[in-house]
Amino acid sequence: MDSSPPNTIIEEAPPRFSELKPPLSEDIIEALDRSGFEVCTPVQAETIPFLCSHKDVVVDAATGSGKTLAFLLPFIEIIRRSNSYPPKPHQVMGVIISPTRELSAQIHKVARAVRLDFAKCREVEADMNTLEEEGANLLIGTPGRLSDMMKRMEFLDFRNLEILILDEADRLLDMGFQKQVNYIISRLPKQRRTGLFSATQTQAVADLAKAGLRNPYLKCEADQKSSQLVHLLIENKNKKLVVFFMTCACVDYWGLVISKIPSLKSISFFPTHGKMDQKGRDTALASFTEASSGVLLCTDVAARGLDIPGIVYIRSLAIKDREVLEKGLKAFVSFVRAYKEHQCSYIFSWKGLEIGKLAMGYGILSFPYISEVKQDRIGIVGFTPVQGITFEDIKFKNKSREKQRQQNLLARKDKLQQEKRGKRKKSSKEAVDDSNKASRKRKLTGRQRQTIQTAQDEEEMNLRL
């Protein structure tokens, strides 16, 4: 009989406040211990590190989840780190907007229980004369009261505000406070941290998040970028967009692929890159500028100095026809090489590039040979080669190109057979020539070596296909 214990699910213990990264200050930890707060709730464990790391947050948090401390503790930590510490009496460093006076009073009570003697926390429902005389560094109130106070009280200084919190954001909008909330946001500095806490994530909350967050972005996996690009084009088919690609080969490939998608047939595409002749580039740019809608596909040849009116989006990325297959391979290899050699290595991190997923996003059927990629990395998680396809059977739609390909294919096969039979033996003169070639190769410049390597890679890919 098997005496091994049954499978059990081991739940990870919630972290303590002293274990959070980046760490909270020692005196904050001591104040929490005195108040009986030692272990984080899930909301606190997820939210506090983000806010303390200069990130905006949108949090799905119900009542009783510990969200009040989740935004109060980062505020305290942020103020202590700021250049304005200690703040002046009327220097407002944080604003917390809540839907009701009762909730504002509750937040104020928690803030007074855990705050340190570094700032004045004030509920705006308090006596205005007291507020004017003593000032406040953290304001907590309803949208109506806060917006009215901001209009009338010029003595409060919001220029160095560090954090804005919207508590119960869904209720704020349901109760008709959107106008006041928008006014408050418009009066505050854009360089701040913003936190939206809501029990439900409605479309109105999402719209408010877009308005309140600064420099927003969505993280997209490498194998999903192509589908997200198509989605963006469909959603904005009557507008003007610019899509930047890493290399000229990428422009050629994606220009060919997306123009054949049925749902994008009504969109005009204008490809341009540095390997096109000047007349072709000028024609593409002029046509795109004059068009009422369309998509400009380009490399950095169009990154500077162009003034094209009406552009809504600028996007950077990062049919059974052999032309698509070969252009896809060339585009993928050129992207990988350009990514590795990019000067901005902090952003274009070679070690962090998910090559397998990237290949899936490019529609690669079988992983090609790339000199920059070690062979043991080809089996990276995320790439699944297509089975049951003979690549030699994929033909060009263009009959003349297909005829030439067949001739080249036969020539390569004959060459390989001759090499296998040993009919091609090097003479002593050829050996000397090879030695001279190796000597000359060592004297080549980096660009020359790269050109030779590219040609060799393309030859290798042709042999594999």
UniProtKB/Swiss-Prot annotation:
**UniProt keyword annotation of Lipoprotein present:** no
Which positions does the motif Q motif occupy? Answer: 17-45
Enumerate the InterPro entries for this protein.
DEAD/DEAH_box_helicase_dom, Helicase_ATP-bd, Helicase_C-like, P-loop_NTPase, RNA-helicase_DEAD-box_CS, RNA_helicase_DEAD_Q_motif, SPB4-like_CTE
Which stretches of sequence are listed as region Disordered? 413-465
Where along the chain is composition biased (Acidic residues)?
A: 456-465
Question: Which is an annotated Pfam family here?
Answer: CTE_SPB4
Alphabetically sorted, this entry's keywords are: ATP-binding, Helicase, Hydrolase, Nucleotide-binding, RNA-binding
- Which residue intervals are annotated with compositional bias (Basic and acidic residues) in the record? 428-437
Residue ranges occupied by any Helicase ATP-binding domain in the UniProt entry: 48-219
Name the Enzyme Commission number(s) assigned to this protein: 3.6.4.13
Query: GO molecular function, one example?
Result: ATP hydrolysis activity
Q: Which reaction does it catalyse?
A: ATP + H2O = ADP + phosphate + H(+)
What PANTHER family is this protein classified in?
Answer: RNA HELICASE (PTHR24031)
- Name the record gives this protein: DEAD-box ATP-dependent RNA helicase 55
Upper lineage is: Eukaryota, Viridiplantae, Streptophyta, Embryophyta, Tracheophyta
